[in-house]
Swiss-Prot record:
Keywords of the record: Disulfide bond, Immunoglobulin domain
Record has Disulfide bond as a keyword: yes
Lineage: Eukaryota, Metazoa, Chordata, Craniata, Vertebrata
Further information: This chain was obtained from pooled immunoglobulin of homozygous b9 rabbits.
Keyword Kinase found: no
InterPro entries assigned to the protein according to its UniProt record, in alphabetical order: Ig-like_dom, Ig-like_dom_sf, Ig-like_fold, Ig_C1-set, Immune_Resp_Modulators
Pfam families associated with the record: C1-set (PF07654)
The protein's name: Ig kappa-b9 chain C region
Length: 104
């Protein structure tokens, strides 16, 4: 089967989360194959190494694609005014999604 690049969505913390001490940003990659996928998180263009949890969903029987959820956890103070980027790469290509905290 030919490789398929993922569809990527980036979700900022919910309003409820912003009242707690820890916030999470979730990057979801859907409908990709094969599962040779890497996720890179950047905060203000600096690659993040910690606070990341990835979970891959097994292939769908319909089209043999995979889904992945990657969560970046931050303290509320860390989250205040930065830009956040999730870069997802597999053999079909790279997809980059980002948002700026100041714009939300």
């Amino acid at each position: 089967d030919p490789p398929i690049a993922p569809t990527v969505l980036l979700f900022p913390p919910s309003a409820d989360q912003l009242t707690t001490z820890t916030v999470t940003i979730v990057c979801v990659a859907n409908k990709f194959r094969p599962d040779d996928i890497t996720v890179t998180w950047k905060v203000d263009d600096e690659i993040q190494q910690s606070g990341i949890e990835n979970s891959t969903t097994p292939q769908s029987p319909e089209d043999c694609t995979y889904x992945l959820s990657s969560t970046l956890s931050l303290t509320k103070a860390q989250y205040n005014s930065h830009s956040y980027t999730c870069q997802v790469h597999n053999s079909a290509g790279s997809i980059v999604z980002s948002f700026n905290r100041g714009d939300c």
